[in-house]
Amino acid sequence: MDFSQGLTPARLIRRYKRFLADVEIEDGTIITVYCPNTGTMRTCSTPNSPVMLSISDNPKRKYAHTLEMIFENHTWIGVNTGRTNSIVAKAILNGSIAEFSGATKVQREITVSKGSRLDLLVDHADQKSYIEIKNCSMAENRRAMFPDAVTARGTKHLRELIKLVKQGENAYIFFLIQREDADSFSPATHIDPLYANTLKEALQQGVQALAYQASVILRALPIILNGSNSPHLPQR
């Protein structure tokens, strides 16, 4: 991630109303900042944790600062979901994602049906792939998980990916793990069983799933479903 104006260190006091957080900056001043994360931020919103803020020079903004990262469990965690798609798009174009090697074009916010869009359409190796991206900031016992709250919208996106595969298209669900204390990924069945079951169905139908960490060097993570270390479901 590129923060051309640098980041401001602070300490989290509380996160509330979904999009707001109170923090204490270095001189002891308490300010309210924008928190662009629609989830619960489970495992990454503990009071008194160190945080990093970016600052905007847009005079129309009510809150100049944005919460970008929080330090918990000995790692920095990216919580600004507004950056997720850009991180993945840049990684694809610079060749960091092996599955999309040779990518020549990345289109964003692709309409696939009335009232429904997916994040990316990638041209690579004489083919096109539709990609829906999910930011993952939650981890427990070294396993990253998504979602951290019930997500009807996320389930809808999986349905759209299934439709595309049935039409002969390539479709991917891409989980970006914005923390480095995880060795694998799995759906958070205990939080949203419908999403988890729909993800399993999507993989059975041919949707491909990827989980990558946002770190200095991106590396693939195994996806755990029903105790299997394969991204595909075990045969019944």
UniProtKB/Swiss-Prot annotation:
Highest taxon of source: Bacteria
HAMAP family: SfsA
Gene of this entry: sfsA
Molecular function per GO: DNA binding
Protein name: Sugar fermentation stimulation protein homolog
InterPro entries: SfsA, SfsA_C, SfsA_N
Family per similarity comment: Belongs to the SfsA family.
